[in-house]
Amino acid sequence: MTPPMNKLTSKLGYTFKETELLNLALTHRSANGKHNERLEFLGDSILSFVIADELYRRFPKVNEGDMSRMRATLVRGNTLAELGREFDLGDYLKLGPGELKSGGFRRDSILADAVEAIIGAIYLDSDLETARRIVLEWYQCRLEEIKPGASQKDPKTRLQEFLQGRRKPLPVYTVTNIKGEAHNQEFTVACEVAGMDTPVIGKGTSRRKAEQAAAETALEQLTHG
């Protein structure tokens, strides 16, 4: 494996025996030849099962409707794209010239599809139990945060919808500082929003939590002045 790919597998928490499976999972159909859509089909089904099974175990008294809503939140495209950005997947995607020019490596749908394809690739490279363990590791924070009956839209989603409803550009999140040791880090994120003079700062124990904190603050400022 090349060093960059080693960096990716470290973020994924899984080292492939068949590296070609990972390469295939990262190959978009625009690149011509073999691509990741069959792996995506497989990974989509595995992800849905793993999350449904985990919700069933975690919430023994919750009804089917609430569990369905929670699962939909966890497996929807923008959640998967968020995961893809946490893995910096855009740096590894194999895209055709047209998609490269149009910024396909940043597109939610392409990132989400690649995450599902990687799940399918992990399953084929190992077994269902290993794929389940890896998926649950990726989703640990999200599973701890999600609650039945509550609004399933997180601050980043609500901020995105608020801006889209006003035909404004999407916010841009940038990590400006990381402090502390590997298992006790504090992330600082700047959130730039069109129409706001200065970036909004958020802090958290992970990049995602810092982004959510920044989005929450930005929403408060936009809605309450």
UniProtKB/Swiss-Prot annotation:
InterPro entries recorded: dsRBD_dom (IPR014720), RNase_III (IPR011907), RNase_III_dom (IPR000999), RNase_III_sf (IPR036389)
Catalytic activity: Endonucleolytic cleavage to 5'-phosphomonoester
Keyword Aminoacyl-tRNA synthetase: no
Listed EC numbers: 3.1.26.3
Subcellular location: Cytoplasm
Subunit (UniProt): Homodimer.
Protein name (record): Ribonuclease 3
Species in which this protein is naturally found: Vibrio cholerae serotype O1 (strain ATCC 39541 / Classical Ogawa 395 / O395)
Lineage, highest ranks first: Bacteria, Pseudomonadati, Pseudomonadota, Gammaproteobacteria, Vibrionales
Gene (name only): rnc
